[in-house]
Amino acid sequence: MGRPRPRAAKTWMFLLLLGGAWAGHSRAQEDKVLGGHECQPHSQPWQAALFQGQQLLCGGVLVGGNWVLTAAHCKKPKYTVRLGDHSLQNKDGPEQEIPVVQSIPHPCYNSSDVEDHNHDLMLLQLRDQASLGSKVKPISLADHCTQPGQKCTVSGWGTVTSPRENFPDTLNCAEVKIFPQKKCEDAYPGQITDGMVCAGSSKGADTCQGDSGGPLVCDGALQGITSWGSDPCGRSDKPGVYTNICRYLDWIKKIIGSKG
């Protein structure tokens, strides 16, 4: 098996979705984050989606009125952020689309090496403040590192099957548990650092392609950003790997504080 890959979207699949490839297709049994379920609409009000035109690139997380966290490997020259979405095709009121004016990857992220997943974190400054309410609001950053066995929630519009890819219209959620760091290191020898945390489940719940940049939420606080994992996704012995937010709190607060 080749190197585990980042979990950014394949945009041509999203274009098929917009073009009606799902018409007449029953999604009840398969439209889930692997091992997950459709989220209760707007239950993840911090969830963001990164778009380049009409192409879904990655997920993201609203952490301030005009700040979104995502994965550094999602960086593009130009994109917009959508907030308040549940269905990507149908609008139901709270959706907002705001251009990104500045992308700030972590300074130690190595964009020239596709095999280096360390420091996979990026802040996006939005042109305008988001209109906040019950369906669009920032999430709190965890003030401590998570512990093995802790139950957490992941969410995104990534593929719901693997290796065959099917991208859902609605936001999907899954419940996962934090892996001990040693078990994570054993699953991916030589690839795991303190800046990463692993999460998965014995039932194969996992994030996958298209979920990159989305949140790992534990006890209502942001603990991780979807980064990379096994290919195919959903292997109980190969958990999803997330950027470990607790290791980057100082950097996040410094950037947001300096930019206002």
From Swiss-Prot:
A Pfam family of this chain: Trypsin
Active site, renumbered: H73, D120, S212
Entry keywords, A to Z: Cytoplasm, Disulfide bond, Glycoprotein, Hydrolase, Protease, Secreted, Serine protease, Signal, Zymogen
Regulation affecting activity: Inhibited by a range of serine protease inhibitors including antipain, aprotinin, leupeptin, benzamidine and soybean trypsin inhibitor.
Enzyme class: hydrolase
Activity-pH dependence: Optimum pH is 8.5. Active from pH 7-10.
Record-listed E.C. numbers: 3.4.21.118
Annotated tissue distribution: Isoform 1 is predominantly expressed in the pancreas. Isoform 2 is expressed in adult brain and hippocampus. Isoform 1 and isoform 2 are found in fetal brain and placenta. Detected in salivary gland, uterus, thymus, breast, testis and kidney but not in spleen, liver, lung or normal ovarian tissue. Displays an 11.5-fold increase in Alzheimer disease hippocampus compared to controls and is overexpressed in some ovarian carcinomas.
Gene3D superfamilies given in the database record: Trypsin-like serine proteases
Signal peptide, first to last residue: 1-28
Residue positions with a glycan: N110
Prosegment location in residue numbers: 29-32
Catalysis: reaction(s): Cleavage of amide substrates following the basic amino acids Arg or Lys at the P1 position, with a preference for Arg over Lys
Record-linked CDD domains: Tryp_SPc (cd00190)
Positions of the Peptidase S1 domain: 33-257
CC terms in the record's Gene Ontology section: cytoplasm; extracellular region; extracellular space; secretory granule; serine protease inhibitor complex
Positions of disulphide bridges: C39-C173, C58-C74, C145-C246, C152-C218, C184-C198, C208-C233
GO BP, sorted A to Z: keratinocyte proliferation; memory; neuron projection morphogenesis; protein maturation; proteolysis; regulation of synapse organization; response to wounding; synapse organization
Subunit structure: Interacts with SPINK9.
Family statement drawn from the similarity comment of this UniProt entry: Belongs to the peptidase S1 family. Kallikrein subfamily.
Known function: Serine protease which is capable of degrading a number of proteins such as casein, fibrinogen, kininogen, fibronectin and collagen type IV. Also cleaves L1CAM in response to increased neural activity. Induces neurite outgrowth and fasciculation of cultured hippocampal neurons. Plays a role in the formation and maturation of orphan and small synaptic boutons in the Schaffer-collateral pathway, regulates Schaffer-collateral long-term potentiation in the hippocampus and is required for memory acquisition and synaptic plasticity. Involved in skin desquamation and keratinocyte proliferation.
Further remark: Expressed at high levels in serum, ascites fluid and tumor cytosol of advanced stage ovarian cancer patients and may serve as a marker of ovarian cancer.
Name by which UniProt lists this protein: Kallikrein-8
Organism of derivation: Homo sapiens (Human)
Gene of this entry: KLK8
